[in-house]
Curated annotation (Swiss-Prot):
Keywords: Membrane, Mitochondrion, Mitochondrion inner membrane, Translocase, Transmembrane, Transmembrane helix. Belongs to the cytochrome c oxidase subunit 3 family. It holds the Pfam family COX3. It is found in: Mitochondrion inner membrane. This is Cytochrome c oxidase subunit 3. Component of the cytochrome c oxidase (complex IV, CIV), a multisubunit enzyme composed of a catalytic core of 3 subunits and several supernumerary subunits. The complex exists as a monomer or a dimer and forms supercomplexes (SCs) in the inner mitochondrial membrane with ubiquinol-cytochrome c oxidoreductase (cytochrome b-c1 complex, complex III, CIII). Component of the cytochrome c oxidase, the last enzyme in the mitochondrial electron transport chain which drives oxidative phosphorylation. The respiratory chain contains 3 multisubunit complexes succinate dehydrogenase (complex II, CII), ubiquinol-cytochrome c oxidoreductase (cytochrome b-c1 complex, complex III, CIII) and cytochrome c oxidase (complex IV, CIV), that cooperate to transfer electrons derived from NADH and succinate to molecular oxygen, creating an electrochemical gradient over the inner membrane that drives transmembrane transport and the ATP synthase. GO terms for biological process: mitochondrial electron transport, cytochrome c to oxygen. Its EC number is 7.1.1.9. One of its GO terms (cellular component) is mitochondrial inner membrane. The keyword Translocase applies. It is a multi-pass membrane protein.
């Protein structure tokens, strides 16, 4: 039932979601992923097969769930102004939770760096650890991320102004800048002079930058979906919630990376 037809019988602007199997499917898939990841890390052979199965199930369930959301908002007219506000508020709360996770990682880093234990030589970085220089690959990554923030803002303004070609070009450039960032980060990890097992320094460093790396992988998927939807004329000048949340996510990750760069690559090294 379209929004125009339903508005004759419904006295409120909210979307009453029809029964869906995807929330419970995603919940069980995530639980299976967490359990199998723990089993794999502790050397249980059965954990590998369950881990890959749960990853596939998570990706499939999330894809189908977002497919339904896109259909409800684009073709069925279910995303009224009130629903769009709710989606934006929900994503904002998700971003706040992500910021709090990184705040905990920074807390652990400062706790270890400002009061280094005697077991690591009483210095930071610990004795035997060669830190990655701030003027090496991390500086290039910082420039790439700042450039991506500029190109996505250009694309967003072009979308609002109805300039579809410029919006597509800006989004396409942004997508490839993020891909280059992820590749450079992978090269940095494979050539790093220390690992996640090298004491508290390696643990906190890879916990912070590695979590950001995983989020950048998620951002690539989100940008690719936005690019496909923009080419399919799913976005209008005033209705592009998916694009707005992706832009917010990119800017938040940009700011978090700046803190990571200043703290872990420049100050901490």
């Amino acid at each position: 039932m379209t929004h125009l037809e339903r508005s004759r019988h419904q006295l409120f602007p909210f979307h009453l979601v029809s029964p869906s199997p995807w929330p419970i499917t995603v919940s069980f898939a995530l639980m299976s992923f967490a359990l199998s990841l723990g089993l794999t890390m502790h050397g249980y052979i059965v954990g590998n097969s369950v881990l890959f199965t749960s990853i596939i199930l998570v990706l499939y369930s999330m894809t189908m769930w977002f497919r339904d959301i896109i259909a409800e908002g684009t073709y069925l007219g279910d995303h009224t102004l009130a629903v769009r506000k709710g989606l934006n508020y929900g994503f904002l709360l998700f971003v706040v939770s992500e910021i709090l996770i990184f705040a905990g990682i920074f807390w652990a880093y400062f706790h270890s760096a400002m009061s280094p234990a005697i077991e690591i030589g009483g210095v930071w970085p610990p004795v035997g650890i060669t830190a990655i220089g701030a003027t090496e690959l991390p500086l290039l990554n910082t420039i790439i991320l700042l450039a991506s923030g500029a190109t996505i803002t250009y694309s967003h303004h072009a979308t609002i102004e109805g300039n579809r070609n410029h919006a597509l070009n800006g989004l396409f450039i942004t997508l490839w800048l993020i891909v280059i960032f992820v590749v450079c980060q992978y090269i940095e990890y494979t050539n790093a002079p220390f690992t996640i097992s090298d004491g508290v320094y390696g643990s906190v460093f890879f916990a912070g930058t590695g979590l950001h790396f995983l989020h950048m992988g998620m951002l690539i998927i989100m940008l690719a979906v936005c690019y496909w939807r923009m080419r399919q004329y799913h976005f209008t000048t005033g209705h592009h919630v998916n694009y707005e949340t992706t832009i917010l996510y990119l800017h938040v990750l940009d700011v978090i990376w700046l803190f990571l760069y200043i703290v872990m690559y420049w100050w901490g090294a």
